[in-house]
């Protein structure tokens, strides 16, 4: 029992002796460090270092860490931490020393300058003993709960942050080199803004700020350089280069016109990025960097593909035609993606142990770190400004978005579009290869073998062909949405199998095994095609941002269900182009605010919220919610329909004791809805059908009046004259005389091929005169006309936009309205011009916000002069003679744009806004959408995308 105790006592003595020995050795090391600072470093024998280490390693715990990117090694010595620990009476420390050794990195680098630390007593033995581990004694000073850098004095609370800072010091020394001048503290100069930095970590953070601004899209592969290579210019390199002429920092302005599509851009960068869309990015196999003696040796891996996320724009020196410095033109391999495994083995196997291969691995890790950091900085910069008024601009087409998520979806659409363009440019496989594939199946047919040997595996069909098949399937679905269930049916599969069998000369393969379920295949590629069409619609709407758009939100009912259809209109050339942006199932509980929020969310995916927008809604949607976002007009067909319904409703007629009118309407409905009448007996009243929001009761009354003779002949042969005898022909004629102009006005206002907004005010004036003239008659017709006048003033509201649009018609101008309203309408035109003139100004958007208050007083006379010129332009236009023939309005304003600039811009915006929100195709679209909803064939999101493709692709 005494043996363990006796053994423990000598062990304690040994530990105390070892502690005293380690303390004495630590004091000798400190004295030797002080002496080396004065006398210089002296070599220490290896034996002495080994003996000293054996004394100090008695009670030392060693921790090892392995970083992800194999950074250079750092040994942590907690000297400051040990000083705060409790010390026993005999001078020994209670807690042993703790050393953290980071293993890994390049073997040829031990310290920041490639040498042993100056204060290290080990000298050259450190390099020999650790063989690839460098000791940085003064890098860490742990005091008061923080990590302090021994080089620059910065303090960090967390170890990871401090490790990143030490890594930046490593990069600093690696970049500056051994021969760099230590006297020059500010060694890193930014060639973009000229700022200088002492430490590489600070310069790296500053360099990331320029990363978002210099990224753009270039069409040619040789223009894709590393943006960070353009930002890093060493001081010695700047001194050796000749001075360059001063160039203004900022975007280049001018008038740039695309030679492919004719779009114009004021700034060179959006124009350059737009031209790149016509020539998609592709990696040419024969591309090589320019032959430059200074840079040819640095580009050692031409097969590494450049990262598509970071493509640098041309520098100003390259644009001016001068030779760029060597630091700018060198091969940009830091941001290139790591090549595939096969390529990596190809050029790394011969020199697997060479420093070049290890440097390539370090550069690839550094590229991933820098690329991720720049991307995170880009996302944080955009996400931090969500509440600001600054828009998010697409670098490819220049379109602005209010929300950052919409910009990301738009950029993905560009990526999908470019990918498909690249795939379409690739050459197809030769026919000989296809014939070889079918040869085994030809033997099968001739020998009557089994079909198992001739089946083609799923991988034999290229992805491009599968995309083409999916596109055709989606086109079939868009042509008739009722074919969703037919596509997966047996008959359709048999038809597809027959087509494949007939097209193959030497056999066939199973369509079901190769393509699988057709619905699944089509819906798999639905988001890709949706993004392709969406980016085209976004570009089309964004190109007309300076003119404004018109947006209609109209509900269409089919039985008990209804849905909202959102459509955007704009002038493209001499025509009005419409785009269906979204379809949403309507609910009785949906208020005007809910519909307004849905409209704004959909519009934010295509256009900016600041764009000038005129909304056209139906009677179910409250105009107060939309008035906050822009001008809100009511559908003219819905307004006239409300006028007719309010007068001819049974409650109103009963209150006015007009029982004969009620009886007449009931008889007309019975005659028009009789099953014994053939279709040819009741033909259509007009070749152009009215919009779907028109009243059906009025149509039945007008139909009976027009086909009265045919109806009487039909019922006389059928010996059913009781219905004809109960029909009041005189009252029918008077009602037809009132309702026919109303329906004719609705048909004119619903014209889809010509502008219609300028016809609203003349229609109101014409109907008002008609009802006033008929009101002087006696009897029931007079009462009805008084009711029509009251309903017209209450339901058919005339907006100032209607008055301005009427003036913009050179055939009408102010002729339809009385003279006492001329000055009021001219004032409305001038007000509307003043409201939108700020967006027409070319330099207003780029004036700093701080300068606007100081220049407000100076711009007052200029604004007054501008108002006077705008008013004179309106009067000059009104003094011109009226057109006798009906002109093409867009063609007319295209010809007089130089003469009447402000009015022309106003005309291209307002005349594209329709007067009627509902269209003839809305009924069919709503029926198909509701059919999909009832049968649950698709999810609401997929249904919306499919309706979008149906409207904008076919």
UniProtKB/Swiss-Prot annotation:
Designated name of the protein: Zinc finger protein 618
Biological process according to GO: regulation of transcription by RNA polymerase II
Organism: Homo sapiens (Human)
Compositionally biased spans, kind Low complexity: 1-19
GO molecular function, a single term: identical protein binding
Location of the region described as Disordered in the Swiss-Prot/TrEMBL record: 1-56, 282-307, 337-390, 421-463
Protein task: Regulates UHRF2 function as a specific 5-hydroxymethylcytosine (5hmC) reader by regulating its chromatin localization.
PANTHER family: ZINC FINGER PROTEIN (PTHR24383), ZINC FINGER PROTEIN 618 (PTHR24383:SF12)
Biased composition (Polar residues): 340-357, 442-459
Subunit structure: Interacts with UHRF2.
């Amino acid at each position: 029992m005494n043996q363990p105790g006796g053994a423990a006592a000598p062990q304690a003595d040994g530990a105390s002796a070892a502690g005293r020995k380690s303390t004495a050795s630590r004091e000798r090391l400190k004295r030797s460090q002080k002496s080396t600072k004065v006398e210089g470093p002296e070599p220490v024998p290896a034996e002495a270092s080994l003996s000293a280490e054996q004394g100090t390693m008695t009670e030392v715990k060693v921790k090892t860490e392995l970083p992800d990117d194999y950074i250079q090694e750092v040994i942590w010595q907690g000297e400051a931490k040990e000083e705060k620990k409790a010390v026993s009476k005999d001078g020994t420390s209670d807690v042993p020393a703790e050393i953290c050794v980071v293993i890994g990195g390049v073997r040829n680098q031990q310290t920041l300058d490639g040498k042993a630390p100056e204060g290290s007593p080990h000298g050259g033995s450190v390099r020999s003993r650790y063989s690839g581990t460098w000791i940085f004694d003064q890098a860490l000073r742990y005091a008061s709960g923080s990590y302090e850098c021994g080089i620059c004095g910065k303090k960090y609370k967390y170890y990871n942050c401090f490790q990143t800072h030490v890594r930046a010091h490593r990069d600093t020394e690696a970049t500056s080199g051994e021969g760099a001048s230590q006297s020059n503290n500010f060694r890193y100069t930014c060639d973009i803004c000229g700022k200088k930095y002492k430490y590489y970590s600070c310069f790296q953070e500053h360099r990331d700020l320029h990363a978002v601004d210099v990224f753009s899209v270039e069409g040619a592969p040789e223009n894709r350089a590393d943006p960070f290579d353009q930002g890093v210019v060493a001081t010695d390199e700047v001194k050796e280069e000749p001075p360059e002429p001063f160039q203004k920092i900022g975007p280049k302005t001018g008038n740039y016109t695309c030679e492919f599509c004719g779009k114009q851009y004021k700034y060179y960068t959006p124009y350059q990025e737009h031209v790149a869309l016509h020539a998609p990015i592709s990696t040419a196999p024969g591309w090589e960097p320019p032959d430059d003696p200074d840079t040819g040796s640095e580009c050692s891996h031409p097969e590494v593909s450049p990262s598509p996320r970071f493509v640098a724009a041309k520098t100003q020196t390259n644009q001016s035609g001068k030779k760029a410095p060597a630091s700018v033109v060198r091969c940009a391999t830091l941001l290139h993606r790591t090549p595939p495994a096969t390529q990596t083995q190809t050029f790394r196997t011969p020199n697997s142990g060479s420093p070049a291969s290890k440097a390539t691995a370090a550069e690839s890790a550094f590229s991933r770190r820098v690329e991720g950091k720049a991307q995170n900085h880009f996302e944080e910069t955009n996400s931090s400004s969500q509440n600001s008024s600054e828009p998010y601009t697409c670098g490819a087409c220049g379109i602005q978005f209010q929300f950052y998520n919409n910009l990301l979806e738009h950029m993905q659409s560009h990526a999908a579009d470019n990918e498909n363009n690249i795939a379409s440019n690739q050459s197809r496989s030769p026919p000989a290869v296809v014939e070889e594939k079918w040869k085994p199946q030809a033997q099968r047919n001739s020998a009557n073998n089994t079909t198992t040997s001739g089946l083609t595996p799923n991988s034999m069909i290229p992805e491009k062909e599968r995309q083409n098949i999916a596109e055709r399937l989606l086109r079939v679905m868009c042509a008739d949405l009722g074919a969703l269930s037919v596509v997966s049916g047996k008959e359709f599969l048999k038809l597809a199998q027959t087509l494949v069998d007939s097209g193959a000369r030497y056999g066939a393969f199973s369509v079901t095994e190769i393509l699988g379920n057709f619905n699944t295949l089509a819906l798999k590629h639905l988001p890709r095609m949706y993004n392709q069409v969406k980016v085209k619609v976004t570009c089309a709407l964004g190109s007309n941002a300076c003119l404004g758009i018109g947006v209609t939100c109209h509900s269409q009912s089919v039985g008990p269900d209804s849905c909202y259809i959102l459509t955007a209109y704009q002038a493209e050339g001499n025509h009005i182009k419409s785009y269906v942006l979204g379809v949403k199932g309507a609910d009785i509980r949906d208020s005007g605010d809910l519909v307004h929020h849905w409209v704004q969310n959909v519009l934010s995916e295509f256009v900016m919220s600041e764009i000038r927008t005129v909304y056209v809604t139906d009677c179910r949607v409250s105009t107060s919610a939309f008035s906050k976002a822009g001008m809100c007009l009511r559908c003219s067909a819905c307004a006239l329909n409300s006028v007719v319904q309010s007068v001819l409703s049974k409650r109103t007629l009963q209150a006015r004791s007009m029982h004969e009118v009620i009886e007449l309407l009931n008889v007309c409905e019975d005659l028009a809805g009789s099953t014994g009448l053939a279709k040819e007996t009741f033909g259509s009243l007009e070749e152009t059908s009215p919009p779907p929001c028109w009243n059906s009761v009025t149509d039945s009354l007008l139909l009976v009046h027009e086909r009265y003779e045919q109806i009487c002949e039909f019922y006389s042969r059928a010996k059913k004259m009781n219905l004809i005898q109960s029909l009041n022909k005189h009252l029918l004629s008077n009602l037809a005389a009132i309702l026919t102009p109303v329906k004719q006005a609705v048909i004119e206002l619903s014209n889809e091929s010509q502008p219609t907004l300028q016809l609203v005010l003349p229609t109101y004036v014409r109907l008002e005169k008609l009802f006033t003239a008929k009101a002087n008659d006696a009897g029931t017709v007079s009462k009805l006309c008084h009711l029509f006048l009251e309903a017209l003033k209450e339901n058919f509201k005339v907006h100032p936009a209607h008055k301005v649009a009427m003036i913009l018609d050179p055939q009408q101008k102010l002729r339809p309205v009385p003279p006492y309203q001329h000055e009021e309408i001219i004032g409305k035109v001038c007000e509307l011009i003043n409201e939108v003139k700020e967006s027409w100004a070319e330099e207003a958007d780029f004036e700093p916000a701080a300068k606007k208050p100081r220049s407000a007083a100076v711009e007052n006379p200029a604004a007054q002069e501008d108002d006077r010129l705008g008013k004179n332009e309106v009067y000059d236009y009104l003094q011109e003679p009226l057109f006798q023939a009906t002109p093409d309005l867009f063609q007319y304003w295209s010809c007089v744009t130089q003469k009447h600039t402000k009015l022309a811009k106003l005309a291209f915006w307002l005349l594209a806004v329709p007067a009627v929100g509902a269209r003839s195709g809305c009924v069919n679209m709503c029926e198909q959408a509701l059919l999909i909803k009832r049968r649950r064939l698709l999810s609401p999101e997929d249904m919306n995308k499919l309706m979008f493709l149906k409207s904008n692709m076919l």
